[in-house]
Amino acid sequence: MQDAAPRLTFTLRDEERLMMKIGVFVPIGNNGWLISTHAPQYMPTFELNKAIVQKAEHYHFDFALSMIKLRGFGGKTEFWDHNLESFTLMAGLAAVTSRIQIYATAATLTLPPAIVARMAATIDSISGGRFGVNLVTGWQKPEYEQMGIWPGDDYFSRRYDYLTEYVQVLRDLWGTGKSDFKGDFFTMNDCRVSPQPSVPMKVICAGQSDAGMAFSAQYADFNFCFGKGVNTPTAFAPTAARMKQAAEQSGRDVGSYVLFMVIADETDDAARAKWEHYKAGADEEALSWLTEQSQKDTRSGTDTNVRQMADPTSAVNINMGTLVGSYASVARMLDEVASVPGAEGVLLTFDDFLSGIETFGERIQPLMQCRAHLPALTQEVA
């Protein structure tokens, strides 16, 4: 029998406030986000990600995001040793979708801002105005050392100064088609980009440190943050409150989008058994690599994304918030997420993406009050 879970009761005014956007964090790297020998083992391919994003679009997901990873963690699972490239993948996905928003990630140490501006304008054309850019500063030193472009460990403390100049160049080029920006890191001399995007280009970030949030408050359209714990859907609330306060100080409205993994089944016990199975197969060698990398940055404080990822509490899925339970239980927990001030959306991963998205669309989302505004489903995608 499916576990019963109490439904939250909201007034109409609350329901309007609690409409929440849903995105999928596509598996651009092998094995998704489970560092376990017991998890599904697969390589990233365009066909897999096309199927995932088309299915997400069918179930009225609002957006799809891909990360960028240039070197993996190794171990028995070769975790993230095999990765596609974000902009080219999302350009392809933009061409085979029609409604869902598409976001690629720029590893800003590897790509000059003028090139990113032009690539983004191109995918804007492909997608019909559905594209945006996620900017990351880079935290894993070996990704950049292997190419000879690591700027030195002082970069850890200056990376948001670098990103501030980077985004100013982007905004110049997208907004006016030219830039003469002069800074410590970038010098533009009548730099031109045309055509410009058809709509204002959205910029997103994932800052959890004070410096990261200050940057997002000033320049981002919204900010990603990690969920926290297992079946503690509102534990991220202090992070969202910090982001909300930082944005208010900048005179802007920058919502938080929260990262969660969904592990669902018919009953709470069945879902919990999956989760325990994945944890029992944790790839300790790959996890050791993650821990080692998290200790390289001694300049950014203790509140960075990578420090949370490496926390041994739930490193098997990089410590993103984890929702484990029956379909009704997961729906209830996601409605709780939507009730947190400043939380405007969630970015979801799944233990098995194709079946997970289908189960979410058919069995979980219909129970969510914060998604009650959605239209009826059309015929299933092929």
UniProtKB/Swiss-Prot annotation:
GO terms for biological process: alkanesulfonate catabolic process; nitrogen utilization; uracil catabolic process. It catalyses: uracil + FMNH2 + NADH + O2 = (Z)-3-ureidoacrylate + FMN + NAD(+) + H2O + H(+); thymine + FMNH2 + NADH + O2 = (Z)-2-methylureidoacrylate + FMN + NAD(+) + H2O + H(+). It is an enzyme of class 1 (oxidoreductase). Coiled coil: none annotated. InterPro entries: Luciferase-like_dom, Luciferase-like_sf, Pyrimidine_monooxygenase_RutA, SsuD_RutA_monooxygenase. Its EC number is 1.14.99.46. Keywords: Flavoprotein, FMN, Monooxygenase, NADP, Oxidoreductase. Disulfide bonds: none annotated. It comes from the Bacteria. Induction: Up-regulated by the nitrogen regulatory protein C (NtrC also called GlnG) and repressed by RutR. Gene3D superfamilies: Luciferase-like domain. The keyword NADP applies. FMN binds at residues 68-69, 134, 143, 159-160, 209. GO terms for molecular function: alkanesulfonate monooxygenase activity; uracil oxygenase activity. PANTHER family: ALKANESULFONATE MONOOXYGENASE, ALKANESULFONATE MONOOXYGENASE-RELATED. Belongs to the NtaA/SnaA/DszA monooxygenase family. RutA subfamily. The FMN-N(5)-oxide reacts spontaneously with NADH to produce FMN. Requires the flavin reductase RutF to regenerate FMN in vivo. This is Pyrimidine monooxygenase RutA. The lineage of its organism: Bacteria, Pseudomonadati, Pseudomonadota, Gammaproteobacteria, Enterobacterales. The gene is rutA.
